[in-house]
Amino acid sequence: MFTPSITTTSDAGAGIGYSSIRVRGTDPSRINITANGIPVNDAESSQVFWTNMGDFASSVENMQIQRGVGTSTNGAGAFGATINMQTEKIGTKPYAGVDLSAGSYASHKETFRFGTGLIKNHWAFQGRLSHIASDGYVDRASTRLDSYFLQGGYFGENTVVKFITFNGKEKTYHAWNYPSVYEMELAGSRRYNSCGEYYDEAGNVHYYKDQSDFYHQQHYQLLLNQIITPTLKFNAALHYTKGFGYYEEYKSGRKLGEYGLVGAESAYFKTKTDLVRQKLMDNDFYGAVASFDYDNRQNLRATVGGGWNRYDGDHYGLVKWVKNTEHIADLQPNHRYYSNNGDKRDANIYGKVSYEFVKGLSAYVDLQYRHINYKMDGPTDDFNGTTQQVFDLEQKYDFFNPKAGLFYQINRNHSVYASYALAHKEPTRNDFEDNINTHLRAEQLNDWELGYKYQSEKFSAGVNFYYMAYRDQFVLTGEQNEIGEFIARNAGESYRRGVELQAAWSPVKWFRWDANATWSHNRAKDWTVTLDDGTAYNLGDTPLSFSPDFIFNNIFTFDYRGFRAALTSQYVGKQRLSNTGFDYYVSEEENGNHNVSMVLKRHFITNLDLAYTFRMKGVKRITAGCTFYNLFSAKYFNNGWTAPSYKKDGNGKVVAYTSSDRYETGYAVSAPFNVMGHLSFEF
């Protein structure tokens, strides 16, 4: 993904399993992702869980990443960034293919692809079947992913109708606790994983074998493209996604009352025991999108469209096993201890006009209205010490999101552009649950972009300046809830500003050099923390979490007579785990204070991919190769959390601290040097 301003994370350490991307420091829940123009983000969390769409990249023909506010045509919730994926076009000729990969940490992938080609000049079908598995770099961080992709289409002179279905089934062992450096040192390994850990009566450590996430997601899309006249087109789509799954975990020392195993009046309400619980989700997401596109093929293009989506999801928890049942009068199988329903409806309409005033100079205006109605009701999994929190909520939002821009093609080599966009985004389910009894406000973003591009036969370059001014931006605090999800809260006024550079040079046919870099300044203007005496303290202007000031990417590509080599490097600057600006907290211990880091240190990694493509009788094409990841075995962390306390020291200065506790910062480790071989056959 060779795009400026991007960083990635991986729970398992080697890229297979739970992973995510951040764009310009924007967390994944603020990145709008679509497939064929249809929303992929989970409607409640706004996240995309890529493990639920295993090997989907093998069925993607084109991926457009738009930094900043995306256009209305790229989805209802375009906000901090947009990723629009177009699945593969159905080819006119039949084919079959097999892709095989295997490498470090017992990682392997098997993919079978086929296409029928055009049948009777109108019909065609295409498909993919995939299996991915890995034990992960982190201990027990195994992943098993099974998926398919199928599409069939009718192709007429003016009409194209396609039906697409794809799914994903995953089983992933938990690795979201992110241990502290101190825990890694005690364990004698940076691969240490505390998820599933428990002790028997003799004090021996064990790991629960089913401490895993299980999920099945099924997608259906029906797409219509109709040419009405040479200048007018109609596009429409229906979609439905079914999701069901759960995660199972061993919990030590939990109160019987917390899980409704005894009544509130019971003398054993606070009695603790070990148990196994499941948290389940059963949801349906469906809707429709449509648009009319007009192009007079001279100087005017216009689009009018909209969409409607509904999400209906049940969240509930089951107790599967209890170690000590002597105080439980009647333990039912699959005892349900909470049940909450979320119902979210989202509608939007938009209009976009692009007009070329004179040759080379054009402008566009994009206006969108969006309405959201979000309801939640029933007890949640949040226990307040007395009972499960009942979360009855209904919120309605109405957003007007205007955008406008100018583009000037100076000549065949030079062009400039400028744009402005106003965007809004509602809080996620996690935002509401993690901030119960707090008045949450929708986010607002004013995004200004200004850029220049140069394009010639052998060299291209571009520079983009951006200023993203937020009001009530939800920023990650650095803290996690008990299932490893990051907690966010409104930041008041904040901003992200920077410059992005891109360049590519290909002096000869067999060599290409690509590079990009981002310099940025990301700040919260008035970040407050709660001191240990309960008072709020304003830290003033502070750096935003997970937002490096500098990112650099570089690729050298050699391609000669079937042999291809690509040397890829990335440098990522320091990232703070909180919004306080503190680089460390002080663990106050009897034998002296100990400073514990609260940052992701800068890192530089290099990957090398080698491949050779050749032909054999009976086989159209064979490609064999090997990818060497983290070539110089850099030891770095790709993600983390921190949750110290804050107080004023003897000089009245606010400091981050804990009382003899080095466990309040944890890290996701990345794998050192590792290898993945790959072999592909095309028939």
Give the predicted meaning of each segment.
Residues 2-39, 55, 61:
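Extracytoplasmic beta-strand/coil segments of soluble accessory domains associated
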